C-alpha cells in the first residue's frame, strides 16, 4: 500500500546513498552550467533574495491594483498649488531648479515636472523638498512655513 504520498525525495548530500552519484553543487559561471547540462545532470535555478532590508511600497501596491482592473484610470499628478508653492519657496531662497535638484539629490527635470504639476507624487521626494525649502507641500496648509512660529 505504498503510494507517492508515503515516498520522500531527498535532495543533496544524503541523496547519494553509498556515495556513488554526482554531488550537488552551485554553478557560479555559465561554463559550469553548460557543462552540467551537457553531462545530463538535473539543473535547478533558484533566486536568492533577502527580505531584511526591503520594505513594501504602497504606490507599487496601488499600481498592481490598477493593473488588475480593466477600467481606464487617470494617474495621480501633483496638484498645481504644490507646484506653485515649490516655485515660490525656491525663488524666495534664490535657488535655481538645478541647485534645488542638487540639494535633494534629484535631476533638474524632476523639479521642473513638480513645479509644472506633471509629476506623479513621490512622498519621499516631497519630504526632501519640504525640508530643503522649509515649506509644507503635503496635507493641509500647503505653502505655509514648515515650522511656524508659535504664538
Curated annotation (Swiss-Prot):
Keywords: Activator, DNA-binding, Transcription, Transcription regulation. PROSITE patterns: HTH_CROC1. It comes from Candida albicans (strain SC5314 / ATCC MYA-2876). Belongs to the MBF1 family. PANTHER family: ENDOTHELIAL DIFFERENTIATION-RELATED FACTOR 1, ENDOTHELIAL DIFFERENTIATION-RELATED FACTOR 1 MULTIPROTEIN BRIDGING FACTOR 1. Residues 86-140 form the HTH cro/C1-type domain. Residues 97-116 bind DNA. The gene is MBF1. Transcriptional coactivator that stimulates GCN4-dependent transcriptional activity by bridging the DNA-binding region of GCN4 and TBP (SPT15), thereby recruiting TBP to GCN4-bound promoters. Involved in induction of the ribosome quality control (RQC) pathway; a pathway that degrades nascent peptide chains during problematic translation. Required to prevent stalled ribosomes from frameshifting. GO terms for biological process: cellular response to nitrogen starvation; GCN2-mediated signaling; maintenance of translational fidelity; rescue of stalled ribosome. This is Multiprotein-bridging factor 1. Residues 1-32 are annotated as: Disordered. InterPro entries: Cro/C1-type_HTH (IPR001387), Lambda_DNA-bd_dom_sf (IPR010982), MBF1_N (IPR013729). One of its GO terms (cellular component) is cytoplasm. One of its GO terms (molecular function) is DNA binding.
